């Protein structure tokens, strides 16, 4: 019996690790996450972007320029923004002081809209929807792409057996080969 739950990313990942959550439908694969999860897919490519005020469009073209901006940067707790971002976090200890860890996209985007943060790191698909709203589309733009990676279904190693994982992987490959995955993508 499965039941969909809307959970903050950080909490969902902790629950996957503990085995109290069996599956998360959208997760980037990393070595750390692979210790606790099986991955099936990928089902799409995710692009992580920096979104900020329109007047920053020609002032921020890379992560080093982003770091020179005054103010906070909002990120989603538990999200993966790529190896360059991870390296920056290790090399720039002061960066931690400038991060606002949001529990989800709504909180992050509310902080941006109220100008309590200078920029936000976000999935491009969410930003594209945000920018369709007249007021926000006039005020904010995508500043740069910071990472692109495949997104998978993640299954908890504590909640899903190796045998079930192999079966899921087999059926995923069958759906890919039959064209069913592509038909689902096109129907969205």
Regions found by a protein language model. Give the residues of each.
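Extracytoplasmic small-molecule ligand-binding "clamshell" domains
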Residues: 1-36, 168, 175, 183, ...
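Short helices/loops that flank or line small-molecule/ion binding pockets
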Residues: 10-22, 38, 105-126, 133
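A ligand-binding cleft/hinge motif common to bilobed small-molecule-binding domains
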Residues: 26-35, 86, 118-147
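Periplasmic-binding protein-like
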Residues: 45-48, 135-172
């Amino acid at each position: 019996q499965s039941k969909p739950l809307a959970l903050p990313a950080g909490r969902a990942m902790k629950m996957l690790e503990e085995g109290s959550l069996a599956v998360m439908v959208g997760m980037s694969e990393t070595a750390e996450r692979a210790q606790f999860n099986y991955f099936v897919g990928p089902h799409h490519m995710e692009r992580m972007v920096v979104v900020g005020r329109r007047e920053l469009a020609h002032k921020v073209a890379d992560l080093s320029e982003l770091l020179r901006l005054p103010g906070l940067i909002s990120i989603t707790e538990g999200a993966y923004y790529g190896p360059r971002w991870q390296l920056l976090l290790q090399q720039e200890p002061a960066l931690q002081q400038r991060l606002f860890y949001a529990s989800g996209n709504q909180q992050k985007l509310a902080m941006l809209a109220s100008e309590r943060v200078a920029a936000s790191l976000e999935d491009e698909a969410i930003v594209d929807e945000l920018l369709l709203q007249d007021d926000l589309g006039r005020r904010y733009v995508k500043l740069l792409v910071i990472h692109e990676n495949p997104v998978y279904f993640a299954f908890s190693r504590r909640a899903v057996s190796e045998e079930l994982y192999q079966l899921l992987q087999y059926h995923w490959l069958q759906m890919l080969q039959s064209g069913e995955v592509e038909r689902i993508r096109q129907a969205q």
